[in-house]
Amino acid sequence: MILEHVLVLSAYLFLIGLYGLITSRNMVRALMCLELILNAVNMNFVTFSDFFDNSQLKGEIFCIFVIAIAAAEAAIGLAIVSSIYRNRKSIRINQSTLLNK
């Protein structure tokens, strides 16, 4: 695959995730958009590692670290969302101002 095609696809994924993160009012949707952004970053790591330095696996190792961090982030985020839903009966971002009270 051509480098430019992969970078354009990764940029589209990143921008879709960023747009969704900025405009979403649902916490679960915001977490999904954050995962989309992290997957676009992973795509860039693997692409640049494949195209520019085949002898070392630095991009793939960074990708594995990002996947591990994203899994931990998703688990913690969903635990927080379920706790907020149990207490507030809503997962909308603008209704869950826990620090104001």
From Swiss-Prot:
Gene Ontology CC, one term: chloroplast thylakoid
Subunit details: NDH is composed of at least 16 different subunits, 5 of which are encoded in the nucleus.
E.C. number(s) listed in UniProt: 7.1.1.-
Subcellular location: Plastid, Chloroplast thylakoid membrane
Enzyme class at the top of the EC tree: translocase
Top-rank taxon, per record: Eukaryota
HAMAP family recorded: NDH1_NuoK
Similarity comment text for this entry: Belongs to the complex I subunit 4L family.
Pfam families documented for this protein: Oxidored_q2 (PF00420)
Catalysed reactions, semicolon-separated: a plastoquinone + NADH + (n+1) H(+)(in) = a plastoquinol + NAD(+) + n H(+)(out); a plastoquinone + NADPH + (n+1) H(+)(in) = a plastoquinol + NADP(+) + n H(+)(out)
Membrane topology: Multi-pass membrane protein
Role according to the record: NDH shuttles electrons from NAD(P)H:plastoquinone, via FMN and iron-sulfur (Fe-S) centers, to quinones in the photosynthetic chain and possibly in a chloroplast respiratory chain. The immediate electron acceptor for the enzyme in this species is believed to be plastoquinone. Couples the redox reaction to proton translocation, and thus conserves the redox energy in a proton gradient.
Keywords, alphabetical: Chloroplast, Membrane, NAD, NADP, Plastid, Plastoquinone, Quinone, Thylakoid, Translocase, Transmembrane, Transmembrane helix, Transport
InterPro entries linked: NADH_UbQ_OxRdtase_chain4L/K, NUOK/Mnh_C1-like
Protein name stated in the entry: NAD(P)H-quinone oxidoreductase subunit 4L, chloroplastic
GO MF annotations in UniProt: NADPH dehydrogenase activity; oxidoreductase activity, acting on NAD(P)H, quinone or similar compound as acceptor; quinone binding
Signal peptide coordinates: none
Stretches that traverse the bilayer: 2-22, 32-52, 61-81
GO biological process: ATP synthesis coupled electron transport; photosynthesis, light reaction; ubiquinone biosynthetic process
